[in-house]
Curated annotation (Swiss-Prot):
Binds 1 [4Fe-4S] cluster per subunit. This is 3-isopropylmalate dehydratase large subunit. Residues 429-451 are annotated as: Disordered. It comes from Mycobacterium sp. (strain JLS). Heterodimer of LeuC and LeuD.
Length: 481
C-alpha cells in the first residue's frame, strides 16, 4: 500500500482508518466526521439513560459483541457478598444488570473473576489493541491510548449513539507532542512524569488536542506506566493521550484472552508497527521535558495542575502573576488548610489510598509492597490498598503481596474504584487529608470536605509509614533479620 505524500501523526492515521463519512463544509461550519468505534466500554453510572433512550426508540444495540460492561464506580470493596447498602448505588448496579441482560451485553458483575475498573479490565483481557477507537462514558478512557488506540470519554447521549450505531460524530482534533527525553532518576515514576506535565502546561493546556507522549523516557516505561500517563491526559484538558505501540506493547498483549493468535497475531503486529508517527509529521503543539530534571511530584491544591516537587513547598499566591491563577491558588489553600511556604514533606495526612484506574495495577501494588515490606503504617494513619480488578487481586495474593499489606497495617480490599471518588462507601470525612494514587484532587472528590494530594504509589507507601508526604528515600533502612 503506497504511503500518503504528507507525513501523518499516529492520531491522524487512526482517525483516517475509522472515517465512515466525512463531514461537509469548511472551517467552523464544517460538519463532524462520522467515526466507527471498535470497542465500547460501559459501567453503571453513565449508561442507564442511554439504555432508556434505546427502549423509547425501540432500537437494539448495534454491536453487542463490541460492547463490554462492568460494575466499578458504586461497588463496595468490603462485604461484596451482601446487598449494596446505599439505595442509589444499588439501583444503578441492578439497572446495569437488567440492561445488559435485556440487550445481550457481556457483563462482569461484582464478584466475577474478571470484574474491576473498566479501564483496567479492557487492557488485561486484551480487548484494547493498537489502532482501535475506544470510547466509554468516563473521563479517563484516555488510559487505553497507551496501546496506540484513540480512546476518549463520552457523554450519556453519545453512549446511546454508539450503542445504537457503533459510530460517533466527531470533529478532528489538534495534535500535541509531549517529548520526555533522557533517563529518569531513581524513584521517579510515570505518575511523577504526568503530574509534572500537567503542572507545566496547565489543566487547559491540552484542550482540543490529542497528546502523543514521545521520547526515550516514555519508551522506557512499562505498559502500566504508559497507562498511568495516558489516564491523566484529560487532567491537562486533552481529549485523548497516546503512546506509539512497540515491542513492550506487543509483549503485554501476547497471549491475552482477546489478543489475536497464530498468523493473525503476526499480521496484527505488522500492522500495528505502521501506526507510529511518520518522520516529518508536524504537530500543532510541542512540549519538551528533560527526564533527568524530574523528581517525585505531589499536588498541593484542588486541581491536578497545582503541583510541585516533593522537595518543594506550598507556593505563595502573592508571587503568582496571573490574577485568575492567584485567586484560584488562594481558594485552594483555604480549602486544603495549608499555609504558603510549608514544606511538602511536613504535610501530615490521615489517610493513604492506593488504587484507581491510574495506579491500581499489579506493578503499582508491587511498588507499594516493596516499600512496606518489614515496615509498619504510622499510628493514626488509615491505609487502603484496593486492586483495580479481581484479576489483579488474585495475582497480588499469589505473590503474597496481600500479606505484606496486612502485616504493615493496611486494609486489603476487593476490586473497585473505591476512594478515587465519593460514590461508594470508601470516602474521607470532612477535613481529612489523603495521599492518593488516583487522578483528581477536586474539592470533595473523595468525600465532602476531604483534602486530596495526588502522589505516586511509592510516595503513597512512604507517606503511610512516616505519616507525612514522603518518598522511600526519606525512610530508614529496614533492619536485617
Amino acid at each position: 500500500m503506497a504511503q500518503p505524500a504528507t507525513p501523518r501523526t499516529m492520531a491522524e492515521k487512526v482517525w483516517a482508518d475509522h472515517v465512515v463519512a466525512h463531514g461537509t463544509g469548511e472551517g467552523a461550519a464544517r460538519e463532524p466526521d462520522l467515526i466507527y468505534i471498535d470497542l465500547h466500554l460501559v459501567h453503571e453510572v453513565t449508561s442507564p439513560q442511554a439504555f432508556d433512550g434505546l427502549r423509547l426508540a425501540n432500537r437494539p444495540v448495534r454491536r453487542p459483541d463490541l460492547t463490554i460492561a462492568t460494575e466499578d464506580h458504586n461497588v463496595p470493596t468490603v462485604d461484596i457478598d451482601k446487598p449494596i447498602a446505599d439505595p442509589v448505588s444499588r439501583t444503578q448496579v441492578e439497572t446495569l444488570r437488567r440492561n445488559c441482560a435485556e440487550f445481550g451485553i457481556r457483563l462482569h458483575p461484582m464478584g466475577d473473576a474478571e470484574q474491576g475498573i473498566v479501564h483496567i479490565i479492557g487492557p488485561q483481557l486484551g480487548l484494547t489493541q493498537p489502532g482501535m477507537t475506544v470510547v466509554c462514558g468516563d473521563s479517563h478512557t484516555s488510559t487505553h491510548g497507551a496501546f496506540g488506540a484513540l480512546a476518549m470519554g463520552i457523554g450519556t447521549s453519545e453512549v446511546e449513539h454508539v450503542l445504537a450505531t457503533q459510530t460517533l460524530p466527531l470533529r478532528p482534533f489538534r495534535t500535541m507532542a509531549v517529548n520526555v527525553d533522557g533517563e529518569l532518576p531513581p524513584g521517579v515514576s510515570a505518575k511523577d512524569i504526568i503530574l509534572a506535565v500537567i503542572a507545566k502546561i496547565g489543566t487547559g493546556g491540552g484542550q482540543g488536542h490529542v497528546i502523543e507522549y514521545r521520547g526515550s523516557a516514555i519508551e522506557s516505561l512499562s505498559m502500566e506506566g504508559r497507562m498511568t500517563i495516558c489516564n491523566m491526559s484529560i487532567e491537562a484538558g486533552a481529549r485523548a493521550g497516546m503512546v506509539a505501540p512497540d515491542d513492550t506493547t506487543f509483549e503485554f498483549l501476547r497471549g491475552r484472552p482477546h489478543a489475536p493468535t497464530g498468523a493473525d497475531w503476526d499480521a496484527a503486529v505488522e500492522a500495528w508497527r505502521q501506526l507510529r508517527t511518520d518522520p516529518g509529521a508536524e504537530f500543532d503543539t510541542e512540549v519538551h521535558l528533560d527526564a533527568a530534571e524530574l523528581s517525585p511530584f505531589v499536588t498541593w491544591g484542588t486541581n491536578p495542575g497545582q503541583g510541585v516537587p516533593l522537595s518543594g513547598a506550598v507556593p505563595d499566591p502573592e508571587l503568582i502573576v496571573d490574577e485568575g491563577e492567584r485567586q484560584a491558588a488562594e481558594k485552594a489553600l483555604t480549602y486544603m488548610g495549608l499555609q504558603a511556604g510549608t514544606a511538602m514533606r511536613d504535610v501530615a495526612v490521615d489517610t493513604v489510598f492506593v488504587g484507581s484506574c491510574t495506579n491500581g495495577r499489579i506493578e503499582d501494588l508491587r511498588v507499594v509492597a516493596d516499600v512496606l515490606r518489614g515496615r509498619r503504617v504510622a499510628d493514626g494513619i488509615r491505609m487502603l490498598v484496593v486492586p483495580g480488578s479481581m484479576r489483579v487481586r488474585a495475582q497480588a495474593e499469589s505473590e503474597g503481596l496481600d500479606r505484606i499489606f496486612i502485616d504493615a497495617g493496611a486494609e486489603w480490599r476487593q476490586a473497585g474504584c473505591s476512594m478515587c471518588l465519593g460514590m461508594n462507601p470508601d470516602q474521607l470525612s470532612p477535613g481529612q487529608r489523603c495521599a492518593s494514587t488516583s487522578n483528581r484532587n477536586f474539592e470533595g472528590r473523595q468525600g465532602k470536605g476531604g483534602r486530596t494530594h495526588l502522589v505516586s504509589p511509592a510516595v503513597a507507601a512512604a507517606t503511610a509509614v512516616r505519616g507525612t508526604l514522603s518518598s522511600p528515600a526519606d525512610l530508614s533502612a529496614v533492619p536485617a533479620r
